[in-house]
């Protein structure tokens, strides 16, 4: 894990540019062996928890499907997270999050036939100066 990057970005709130998926904001929080993406989608607060070197289970937001997720830093400022959907529907949602000095880019790809359409594409956000 890149401790320097996690301490710089953990807890920062990013506001997304208007997008068709209706994501409005994004925050990443980290502990030693876990992380959490918190975001607003369709006006609802949502979270995806994941582990580093382990799977963390939860309920996938919007669709209420069980998932198991883990993440890995693939470079100094790029985090890759895969959430395996393990419920009535089976598939996965992939996140590649690139943290800049004052911005974030979130690339998302779903591997499931009928759901999770919001989690396909990319989002660009800027650090929010509002608190």
Question: Model features per residue range: what roles?
Answer:
Residues 1-131:
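Peripheral terminal and inter-domain segments
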């Amino acid at each position: 894990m890149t401790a320097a990057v996690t301490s710089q970005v953990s807890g920062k709130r990013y506001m997304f540019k208007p997008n068709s998926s209706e994501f409005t904001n994004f925050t990443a929080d980290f502990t030693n062996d876990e992380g959490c993406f918190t975001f607003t989608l369709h006006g609802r607060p949502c979270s995806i928890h994941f582990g580093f070197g382990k799977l963390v289970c939860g309920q996938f937001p919007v669709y209420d499907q069980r998932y198991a997720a883990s993440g890995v830093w693939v470079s100094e400022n790029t985090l890759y997270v895969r959430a395996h959907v393990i419920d009535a529907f089976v598939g996965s949602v992939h996140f590649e999050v690139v943290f800049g000095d004052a911005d974030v880019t979130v690339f998302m790809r779903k591997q499931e036939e009928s759901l999770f359409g919001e989690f396909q594409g990319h989002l660009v956000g800027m650090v929010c100066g509002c608190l």
